[in-house]
Protein backbone atom coordinates (compact mmCIF):
# COMPACT_ATOMS: atom_id res chain seq x y z
CA UNK A 1 0.00 0.00 0.00
CA UNK A 2 1.40 3.36 -1.08
CA UNK A 3 0.02 6.85 -1.53
CA UNK A 4 -0.28 6.15 -5.26
CA UNK A 5 -1.70 2.62 -5.00
CA UNK A 6 -4.65 1.43 -2.91
CA UNK A 7 -4.34 -1.49 -0.51
CA UNK A 8 -4.17 -4.55 -2.77
CA UNK A 9 -5.14 -7.98 -1.47
CA UNK A 10 -4.75 -11.14 -3.54
CA UNK A 11 -6.98 -14.08 -2.67
CA UNK A 12 -7.49 -17.65 -3.87
CA UNK A 13 -10.61 -19.63 -2.91
CA UNK A 14 -11.08 -23.17 -4.19
CA UNK A 15 -14.60 -24.14 -3.15
CA UNK A 16 -17.95 -22.74 -1.99
CA UNK A 17 -17.01 -22.64 1.70
CA UNK A 18 -13.92 -20.61 0.80
CA UNK A 19 -16.00 -18.26 -1.36
CA UNK A 20 -18.24 -17.55 1.66
CA UNK A 21 -15.21 -16.87 3.88
CA UNK A 22 -13.58 -14.71 1.22
CA UNK A 23 -16.73 -12.63 0.75
CA UNK A 24 -16.98 -12.03 4.51
CA UNK A 25 -13.33 -11.01 4.67
CA UNK A 26 -13.63 -8.63 1.70
CA UNK A 27 -16.76 -7.06 3.21
CA UNK A 28 -15.00 -6.47 6.54
CA UNK A 29 -11.91 -5.03 4.81
CA UNK A 30 -13.98 -2.67 2.63
CA UNK A 31 -15.61 -1.23 5.77
CA UNK A 32 -12.14 -0.25 6.99
CA UNK A 33 -10.46 0.53 3.64
CA UNK A 34 -13.20 1.44 1.13
CA UNK A 35 -10.85 1.84 -1.86
CA UNK A 36 -9.01 -1.47 -1.39
CA UNK A 37 -8.50 -3.68 -4.45
CA UNK A 38 -9.12 -7.44 -4.42
CA UNK A 39 -7.89 -9.83 -7.13
CA UNK A 40 -7.39 -13.55 -7.61
CA UNK A 41 -9.43 -16.74 -7.87
CA UNK A 42 -12.96 -16.01 -6.71
CA UNK A 43 -16.44 -17.48 -6.63
CA UNK A 44 -19.70 -15.60 -7.18
CA UNK A 45 -19.95 -14.27 -3.61
CA UNK A 46 -16.43 -12.82 -3.63
CA UNK A 47 -17.03 -11.31 -7.06
CA UNK A 48 -20.28 -9.75 -5.81
CA UNK A 49 -18.21 -8.04 -3.10
CA UNK A 50 -15.91 -6.59 -5.76
CA UNK A 51 -13.14 -9.17 -6.18
CA UNK A 52 -11.62 -9.17 -9.67
CA UNK A 53 -11.51 -12.82 -10.80
CA UNK A 54 -8.46 -13.78 -12.82
CA UNK A 55 -9.82 -17.33 -12.72
CA UNK A 56 -13.20 -18.69 -11.71
CA UNK A 57 -13.24 -20.69 -8.47
CA UNK A 58 -14.77 -23.70 -10.28
CA UNK A 59 -11.41 -24.21 -12.00
CA UNK A 60 -9.98 -25.36 -8.66
CA UNK A 61 -13.06 -27.15 -7.28
CA UNK A 62 -12.06 -30.71 -8.14
CA UNK A 63 -12.48 -33.70 -5.83
CA UNK A 64 -11.12 -37.22 -5.87
CA UNK A 65 -7.78 -38.45 -7.17
CA UNK A 66 -9.10 -39.39 -10.64
CA UNK A 67 -10.61 -35.94 -11.21
CA UNK A 68 -7.48 -34.21 -9.88
CA UNK A 69 -5.22 -36.27 -12.17
CA UNK A 70 -7.45 -35.46 -15.14
CA UNK A 71 -7.12 -31.74 -14.40
CA UNK A 72 -3.55 -31.73 -13.11
CA UNK A 73 -1.97 -30.01 -16.12
CA UNK A 74 -4.55 -27.20 -15.97
CA UNK A 75 -4.17 -26.80 -12.18
CA UNK A 76 -0.38 -26.60 -12.46
CA UNK A 77 -0.71 -24.04 -15.27
CA UNK A 78 -3.04 -21.88 -13.14
CA UNK A 79 -0.70 -22.03 -10.15
CA UNK A 80 2.33 -21.11 -12.28
CA UNK A 81 0.42 -18.24 -13.90
CA UNK A 82 -0.77 -16.92 -10.53
CA UNK A 83 2.78 -17.12 -9.16
CA UNK A 84 3.97 -14.99 -12.10
CA UNK A 85 1.10 -12.48 -12.09
CA UNK A 86 0.98 -12.01 -8.31
CA UNK A 87 4.77 -11.67 -8.38
CA UNK A 88 4.43 -8.81 -10.86
CA UNK A 89 1.48 -7.21 -9.01
CA UNK A 90 3.19 -7.42 -5.60
CA UNK A 91 -0.03 -7.36 -3.52
CA UNK A 92 0.25 -6.10 0.04
CA UNK A 93 -0.93 -9.49 1.31
CA UNK A 94 -1.86 -12.81 -0.29
CA UNK A 95 -4.64 -14.81 1.42
CA UNK A 96 -5.00 -18.47 0.49
CA UNK A 97 -8.44 -19.59 1.67
CA UNK A 98 -8.48 -23.30 2.55
CA UNK A 99 -7.63 -25.51 -0.54
CA UNK A 100 -4.28 -26.38 1.10
CA UNK A 101 -3.03 -28.70 -1.65
CA UNK A 102 -3.17 -25.78 -4.09
CA UNK A 103 -2.60 -22.79 -1.86
CA UNK A 104 0.27 -23.76 0.44
CA UNK A 105 2.68 -24.30 -2.46
CA UNK A 106 1.47 -21.04 -4.04
CA UNK A 107 1.98 -19.25 -0.71
CA UNK A 108 5.54 -20.60 -0.54
CA UNK A 109 6.26 -19.40 -4.09
CA UNK A 110 4.99 -15.90 -3.27
CA UNK A 111 6.73 -15.66 0.09
CA UNK A 112 10.06 -16.32 -1.68
CA UNK A 113 9.29 -13.21 -3.78
CA UNK A 114 8.83 -11.10 -0.65
CA UNK A 115 5.02 -11.14 -0.63
CA UNK A 116 3.36 -11.52 2.78
CA UNK A 117 1.15 -14.60 2.92
CA UNK A 118 -1.76 -15.77 5.06
CA UNK A 119 -3.35 -19.22 5.06
CA UNK A 120 -6.99 -18.90 6.10
CA UNK A 121 -8.43 -22.13 7.63
CA UNK A 122 -5.93 -24.52 9.12
CA UNK A 123 -5.64 -27.95 7.52
CA UNK A 124 -6.13 -30.76 10.06
CA UNK A 125 -2.39 -30.97 10.75
CA UNK A 126 -3.11 -31.39 14.46
CA UNK A 127 -4.88 -34.68 13.64
CA UNK A 128 -2.72 -36.35 11.01
CA UNK A 129 0.35 -35.77 8.79
CA UNK A 130 1.61 -33.41 11.48
CA UNK A 131 4.90 -32.78 9.69
CA UNK A 132 2.96 -30.58 7.22
CA UNK A 133 3.22 -27.89 9.90
CA UNK A 134 6.84 -27.26 8.85
CA UNK A 135 5.85 -26.68 5.20
CA UNK A 136 3.05 -24.37 6.33
CA UNK A 137 5.51 -22.47 8.53
CA UNK A 138 7.90 -21.97 5.60
CA UNK A 139 5.10 -20.91 3.23
CA UNK A 140 3.11 -18.49 5.38
CA UNK A 141 3.56 -15.44 7.55
CA UNK A 142 0.36 -16.25 9.44
CA UNK A 143 -2.27 -18.98 9.78
CA UNK A 144 -5.83 -17.94 10.65
CA UNK A 145 -7.41 -20.70 12.74
CA UNK A 146 -11.06 -21.29 13.56
CA UNK A 147 -10.48 -23.29 16.74
CA UNK A 148 -8.38 -22.64 19.87
CA UNK A 149 -6.70 -26.06 19.93
CA UNK A 150 -5.41 -25.38 16.41
CA UNK A 151 -3.55 -22.28 17.62
CA UNK A 152 -2.13 -24.28 20.55
CA UNK A 153 -0.75 -26.81 18.04
CA UNK A 154 0.94 -24.14 15.89
CA UNK A 155 2.34 -22.41 18.98
CA UNK A 156 4.10 -25.66 19.88
CA UNK A 157 5.99 -25.48 16.57
CA UNK A 158 6.54 -21.68 16.64
CA UNK A 159 4.42 -21.14 13.53
CA UNK A 160 2.60 -17.76 13.71
CA UNK A 161 -1.11 -18.43 14.12
CA UNK A 162 -4.10 -16.33 15.15
CA UNK A 163 -7.30 -17.82 16.57
CA UNK A 164 -10.17 -15.82 15.06
CA UNK A 165 -13.18 -17.90 16.10
CA UNK A 166 -15.51 -19.78 13.76
CA UNK A 167 -17.77 -18.08 11.22
CA UNK A 168 -20.46 -20.70 11.84
CA UNK A 169 -20.48 -19.76 15.54
CA UNK A 170 -21.00 -16.12 14.51
CA UNK A 171 -23.88 -17.05 12.22
CA UNK A 172 -25.82 -19.23 14.67
CA UNK A 173 -27.64 -17.83 17.73
CA UNK A 174 -26.54 -18.79 21.23
CA UNK A 175 -30.15 -19.72 22.03
CA UNK A 176 -31.82 -21.34 19.00
CA UNK A 177 -35.59 -21.19 18.47
CA UNK A 178 -36.53 -24.87 18.81
CA UNK A 179 -40.29 -24.37 18.48
CA UNK A 180 -39.77 -22.07 15.50
CA UNK A 181 -37.72 -24.79 13.76
CA UNK A 182 -40.44 -27.34 14.56
CA UNK A 183 -43.06 -25.06 13.03
CA UNK A 184 -41.02 -24.87 9.82
CA UNK A 185 -40.70 -28.68 9.67
CA UNK A 186 -44.25 -29.46 10.81
CA UNK A 187 -43.16 -31.19 14.03
CA UNK A 188 -45.49 -30.85 17.07
CA UNK A 189 -43.94 -28.87 19.92
CA UNK A 190 -44.58 -31.66 22.47
CA UNK A 191 -43.30 -34.60 20.38
CA UNK A 192 -39.99 -36.39 20.88
CA UNK A 193 -37.84 -35.74 17.81
CA UNK A 194 -34.70 -37.45 16.51
CA UNK A 195 -32.51 -36.24 13.62
CA UNK A 196 -30.58 -38.78 11.55
CA UNK A 197 -27.66 -37.35 9.55
CA UNK A 198 -25.82 -40.18 7.81
CA UNK A 199 -23.28 -37.92 6.10
CA UNK A 200 -22.85 -35.90 2.93
CA UNK A 201 -20.68 -38.33 0.96
CA UNK A 202 -21.99 -41.35 -0.88
CA UNK A 203 -19.67 -43.73 0.97
CA UNK A 204 -20.88 -42.44 4.35
CA UNK A 205 -24.56 -42.76 3.46
CA UNK A 206 -23.90 -46.29 2.19
CA UNK A 207 -22.03 -47.37 5.34
CA UNK A 208 -24.22 -45.69 7.98
CA UNK A 209 -27.83 -45.49 6.81
CA UNK A 210 -28.86 -49.07 7.61
CA UNK A 211 -27.53 -48.94 11.17
CA UNK A 212 -29.02 -45.48 11.73
CA UNK A 213 -32.46 -46.67 10.52
CA UNK A 214 -32.33 -49.81 12.69
CA UNK A 215 -31.42 -47.59 15.65
CA UNK A 216 -34.49 -45.44 14.98
CA UNK A 217 -36.66 -48.57 14.88
CA UNK A 218 -35.37 -49.58 18.32
CA UNK A 219 -36.03 -46.10 19.73
CA UNK A 220 -39.61 -46.19 18.41
CA UNK A 221 -40.22 -49.13 20.77
CA UNK A 222 -39.61 -46.79 23.73
CA UNK A 223 -41.04 -43.66 22.09
CA UNK A 224 -43.91 -44.71 19.79
CA UNK A 225 -44.59 -41.03 18.97
CA UNK A 226 -40.97 -40.39 17.96
CA UNK A 227 -40.69 -37.99 15.04
CA UNK A 228 -37.68 -38.79 12.85
CA UNK A 229 -36.23 -36.15 10.54
CA UNK A 230 -33.60 -37.02 7.93
CA UNK A 231 -32.01 -34.05 6.12
CA UNK A 232 -30.10 -35.07 2.99
CA UNK A 233 -27.68 -32.77 1.21
CA UNK A 234 -28.82 -33.37 -2.37
CA UNK A 235 -31.10 -35.45 -4.61
CA UNK A 236 -28.45 -38.13 -5.15
CA UNK A 237 -28.00 -38.74 -1.41
CA UNK A 238 -31.78 -38.74 -0.91
CA UNK A 239 -32.24 -41.37 -3.63
CA UNK A 240 -29.47 -43.46 -2.06
CA UNK A 241 -31.02 -43.20 1.42
CA UNK A 242 -34.51 -44.07 0.11
CA UNK A 243 -33.12 -47.21 -1.57
CA UNK A 244 -31.47 -48.36 1.68
CA UNK A 245 -34.59 -47.55 3.71
CA UNK A 246 -36.76 -49.62 1.33
CA UNK A 247 -34.50 -52.61 2.03
CA UNK A 248 -33.96 -52.14 5.79
CA UNK A 249 -36.95 -50.29 7.26
CA UNK A 250 -39.73 -49.94 4.65
CA UNK A 251 -42.44 -49.36 7.28
CA UNK A 252 -40.56 -46.79 9.37
CA UNK A 253 -42.18 -43.37 8.93
CA UNK A 254 -39.65 -40.54 8.64
CA UNK A 255 -39.60 -36.93 7.40
CA UNK A 256 -37.11 -36.76 4.51
CA UNK A 257 -35.80 -33.23 4.04
CA UNK A 258 -33.96 -31.66 1.11
CA UNK A 259 -31.14 -29.85 2.88
CA UNK A 260 -32.45 -28.12 6.02
CA UNK A 261 -29.87 -29.86 8.21
CA UNK A 262 -29.60 -26.90 10.56
CA UNK A 263 -33.37 -26.66 11.02
CA UNK A 264 -33.50 -30.40 11.73
CA UNK A 265 -30.80 -30.11 14.41
CA UNK A 266 -32.44 -27.12 16.11
CA UNK A 267 -35.84 -28.87 16.09
CA UNK A 268 -34.61 -32.20 17.49
CA UNK A 269 -34.18 -33.49 21.04
CA UNK A 270 -31.23 -35.60 19.90
CA UNK A 271 -29.25 -36.35 16.75
CA UNK A 272 -27.39 -39.37 15.44
CA UNK A 273 -24.79 -38.24 12.96
CA UNK A 274 -21.58 -38.96 11.14
CA UNK A 275 -18.56 -37.02 12.33
CA UNK A 276 -17.31 -33.91 10.53
CA UNK A 277 -18.56 -30.35 10.33
CA UNK A 278 -22.10 -31.60 11.07
CA UNK A 279 -21.05 -32.38 14.65
CA UNK A 280 -19.88 -28.79 15.16
CA UNK A 281 -23.09 -27.44 13.62
CA UNK A 282 -25.13 -29.74 15.87
CA UNK A 283 -23.25 -28.45 18.92
CA UNK A 284 -23.98 -24.85 17.88
CA UNK A 285 -27.65 -25.83 17.40
CA UNK A 286 -27.56 -27.03 21.05
CA UNK A 287 -28.82 -30.46 20.00
CA UNK A 288 -27.49 -33.37 22.13
CA UNK A 289 -25.89 -35.94 19.86
CA UNK A 290 -24.26 -39.31 19.39
CA UNK A 291 -21.57 -39.69 16.73
CA UNK A 292 -21.59 -42.97 14.81
CA UNK A 293 -19.05 -43.71 12.10
CA UNK A 294 -17.93 -46.65 10.00
CA UNK A 295 -15.38 -46.99 7.24
CA UNK A 296 -13.82 -49.86 5.35
CA UNK A 297 -11.65 -52.01 7.69
CA UNK A 298 -8.33 -51.20 6.03
CA UNK A 299 -9.15 -47.46 5.96
CA UNK A 300 -9.99 -47.59 9.67
CA UNK A 301 -6.80 -49.53 10.45
CA UNK A 302 -4.78 -46.91 8.58
CA UNK A 303 -6.63 -44.00 10.20
CA UNK A 304 -5.98 -45.36 13.69
CA UNK A 305 -2.25 -45.28 12.96
CA UNK A 306 -2.21 -41.87 11.29
CA UNK A 307 -4.63 -39.86 13.44
CA UNK A 308 -2.97 -38.36 16.52
CA UNK A 309 -6.06 -37.18 18.45
CA UNK A 310 -8.05 -38.96 21.15
CA UNK A 311 -11.40 -38.03 19.59
CA UNK A 312 -12.86 -37.68 16.10
CA UNK A 313 -15.66 -35.16 16.71
CA UNK A 314 -15.09 -31.42 17.04
CA UNK A 315 -17.25 -31.02 20.19
CA UNK A 316 -15.01 -33.50 22.01
CA UNK A 317 -11.83 -31.91 20.67
CA UNK A 318 -13.06 -28.50 21.84
CA UNK A 319 -14.09 -29.82 25.25
CA UNK A 320 -10.92 -31.89 25.70
CA UNK A 321 -13.02 -34.84 26.90
CA UNK A 322 -15.74 -37.20 25.71
CA UNK A 323 -18.61 -34.75 25.86
CA UNK A 324 -20.56 -36.64 23.18
CA UNK A 325 -20.52 -40.40 22.72
CA UNK A 326 -18.44 -41.60 19.78
CA UNK A 327 -19.27 -45.11 18.55
CA UNK A 328 -16.89 -46.11 15.78
CA UNK A 329 -16.57 -49.13 13.53
CA UNK A 330 -17.80 -52.32 15.34
CA UNK A 331 -19.21 -50.12 18.14
CA UNK A 332 -21.41 -48.36 15.59
CA UNK A 333 -24.29 -50.84 15.78
CA UNK A 334 -28.00 -50.30 16.50
CA UNK A 335 -28.18 -51.61 20.09
CA UNK A 336 -25.29 -49.44 21.30
CA UNK A 337 -26.39 -46.40 19.32
CA UNK A 338 -29.92 -46.67 20.71
CA UNK A 339 -28.65 -47.12 24.28
CA UNK A 340 -26.57 -43.93 23.94
CA UNK A 341 -29.48 -41.95 22.48
CA UNK A 342 -32.19 -42.98 24.96
CA UNK A 343 -31.03 -40.73 27.84
CA UNK A 344 -30.73 -37.80 25.41
CA UNK A 345 -34.30 -38.20 24.18
CA UNK A 346 -35.49 -38.22 27.80
CA UNK A 347 -34.51 -34.52 28.05
CA UNK A 348 -33.14 -35.05 31.54
CA UNK A 349 -29.89 -34.19 33.34
CA UNK A 350 -27.66 -35.65 30.61
CA UNK A 351 -29.24 -33.50 27.91
CA UNK A 352 -29.28 -30.35 30.02
CA UNK A 353 -25.62 -30.71 31.01
CA UNK A 354 -24.64 -31.28 27.37
CA UNK A 355 -26.69 -28.27 26.27
CA UNK A 356 -25.01 -26.01 28.86
CA UNK A 357 -21.53 -27.14 27.79
CA UNK A 358 -22.43 -26.65 24.12
CA UNK A 359 -23.42 -23.07 24.93
CA UNK A 360 -20.12 -22.42 26.76
CA UNK A 361 -18.12 -23.82 23.83
CA UNK A 362 -20.19 -21.74 21.39
CA UNK A 363 -19.27 -18.58 23.30
CA UNK A 364 -15.57 -19.54 23.21
CA UNK A 365 -15.48 -19.68 19.40
CA UNK A 366 -17.91 -16.81 18.71
CA UNK A 367 -15.39 -14.04 18.09
CA UNK A 368 -16.62 -12.21 14.95
CA UNK A 369 -14.28 -14.11 12.65
CA UNK A 370 -14.69 -11.86 9.59
CA UNK A 371 -13.59 -8.80 11.60
CA UNK A 372 -10.72 -10.69 13.23
CA UNK A 373 -9.50 -11.93 9.85
CA UNK A 374 -9.68 -8.41 8.38
CA UNK A 375 -7.71 -7.01 11.32
CA UNK A 376 -5.02 -9.67 10.85
CA UNK A 377 -4.72 -8.85 7.13
CA UNK A 378 -4.37 -5.11 7.81
CA UNK A 379 -1.77 -5.63 10.54
CA UNK A 380 0.32 -7.78 8.18
CA UNK A 381 -0.08 -5.26 5.35
CA UNK A 382 1.47 -2.43 7.39
UniProtKB/Swiss-Prot annotation:
Pathway: Glycolipid biosynthesis; lipid IV(A) biosynthesis; lipid IV(A) from (3R)-3-hydroxytetradecanoyl-[acyl-carrier-protein] and UDP-N-acetyl-alpha-D-glucosamine: step 5/6. It comes from the Bacteria. It is an enzyme of class 2 (transferase). Keywords: Glycosyltransferase, Lipid A biosynthesis, Lipid biosynthesis, Lipid metabolism, Transferase. GO terms for biological process: lipid A biosynthetic process. Its EC number is 2.4.1.182. Pfam families: LpxB (PF02684). GO terms for cellular component: membrane. InterPro entries: Glyco_trans_19 (IPR003835). One of its GO terms (molecular function) is phospholipid binding. CDD domains: Glycosyltransferase_GTB-type. It catalyses: 2-N,3-O-bis[(3R)-3-hydroxytetradecanoyl]-alpha-D-glucosaminyl 1-phosphate + UDP-2-N,3-O-bis[(3R)-3-hydroxytetradecanoyl]-alpha-D-glucosamine = lipid A disaccharide (E. coli) + UDP + H(+); a lipid X + a UDP-2-N,3-O-bis[(3R)-3-hydroxyacyl]-alpha-D-glucosamine = a lipid A disaccharide + UDP + H(+). The keyword Transferase applies. NCBIfam families: lpxB. Condensation of UDP-2,3-diacylglucosamine and 2,3-diacylglucosamine-1-phosphate to form lipid A disaccharide, a precursor of lipid A, a phosphorylated glycolipid that anchors the lipopolysaccharide to the outer membrane of the cell. Belongs to the LpxB family. This is Lipid-A-disaccharide synthase. It comes from Escherichia coli O127:H6 (strain E2348/69 / EPEC).
Amino acid sequence: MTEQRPLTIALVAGETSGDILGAGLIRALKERVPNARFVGVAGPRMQAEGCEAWYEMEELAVMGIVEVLGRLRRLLHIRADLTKRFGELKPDVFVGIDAPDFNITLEGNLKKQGIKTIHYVSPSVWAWRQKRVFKIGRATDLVLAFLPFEKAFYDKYNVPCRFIGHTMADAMPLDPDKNGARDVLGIPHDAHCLALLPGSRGAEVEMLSADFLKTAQLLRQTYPDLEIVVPLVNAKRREQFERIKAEVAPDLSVHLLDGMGREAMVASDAALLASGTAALECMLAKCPMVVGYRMKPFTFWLAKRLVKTDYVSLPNLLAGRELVKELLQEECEPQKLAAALLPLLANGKTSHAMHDTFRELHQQIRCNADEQAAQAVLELAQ
